[in-house]
Amino acid sequence: MTAHGFLEITTPILTASSPEGARDYLVPARKHPGKFYALPQAPQQFKQLLMTAGFDRYFQIAPCFRDEDARGDRSPGEFYQLDMEMAFATQDDVFAVLEDVLPPIFAKYGKYDIASEAPFRRISYHDAMETYGSDKPDLRIDLTVQDMTALVAGSDFAPFAAGNTVKAVVVPDCAMARKAVDKLCADVEVQAGSKPYWFKVDEQGNFTGGIAKFLTDKTAEITAALGLKPGCFVGVTAGKKTAAQKTAGVLRTKLGMAVPGHMDKERYEFCWIVDFPMYEIGEESGELEFCHNPFSMPNGGLEILEKAERGEVDPLDIYAYQYDLVCNGVELSSGAVRNHDPEIMVKAFELVRLGEDDVKAKFPAMYNAFCYGAPPHAGIAPGVDRMVMLLAGEDCIREIIPFPMNKNAQ
């Protein structure tokens, strides 16, 4: 990082609470009874303030504290990230730094000696969900997700009912036994929360097993559209669009790992996921919410937000200059070109029913600093623990942490 002109600066550990997406860890303030410090979930606001103060390239190995549930790639409590920010920078500038820094490290110190070379592949969020069923696809797997919604329209099979999205994952030359298929489908249902279906193509080109009986009148059409041949196994998912996509993504990964010849495991395959939606409809609230980082610059700036406010543009069609770095199906980091203009920031929050007073109350230091003028800036923060997990070839992050917490954060 220093070779790229970055200056290492440490930011405060005892700070004020700020909405970052998880719950805070609080520390009582001895001299101020009834008040608390918060441990930082990320140095997000601090590093943006550094850009405003004239430090054009910052980095640190930043400790982050989040009270959130454990996962295979997420340890509860604390973790570390290679936090960086660049002034007068674009998305491409951020990509260029990490594409130069990371591959040599992974090739030299990783369990596998092959790593993607620059430039990393770029995939839009929409294409990632449509093609891989995931916004963190494992590109070592050569299987893809196909849409078969129109192909099964009018089917008597209840999950294919009108309004549902139907996805398929085709595996050529698959000799998986019925018992193994049942176990794989059960594992997918546990992980995705939705049941997958399946059928096979026999030597005569007929559909057999699973849900084949519901597709007999559409055999020729489905065969042509999906490119099926004798010996193919077809995994199928159905449901609301996002649920069907995500279940297909889990199914794709499980099949790629289970069926020989479809996963080149001994390599590090990086990619960028770009063009994330700025907004989404909240599952619980049913109202418009930020999809990811509220500090991201919308693609189209103030003009696109004003059009959305007037009803000329659907807010769900607004994209953010946000990106994720993914390696072997693991999200290493999220980053963004930041929203450095207070007018655009306020307008972005107004679309989710928060006004200027709310922005000032939630982000007073950053809002005030931006009012004096801030340079365009962008950044990212790859997770150090996750990188070490990949370097060591481990599937669980707790295996590489010297004193890890358990799933109950103990």
Regions found by a protein language model. Name each.
Residues 2-410:
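Class II aminoacyl-tRNA synthetase catalytic cores and aaRS-like
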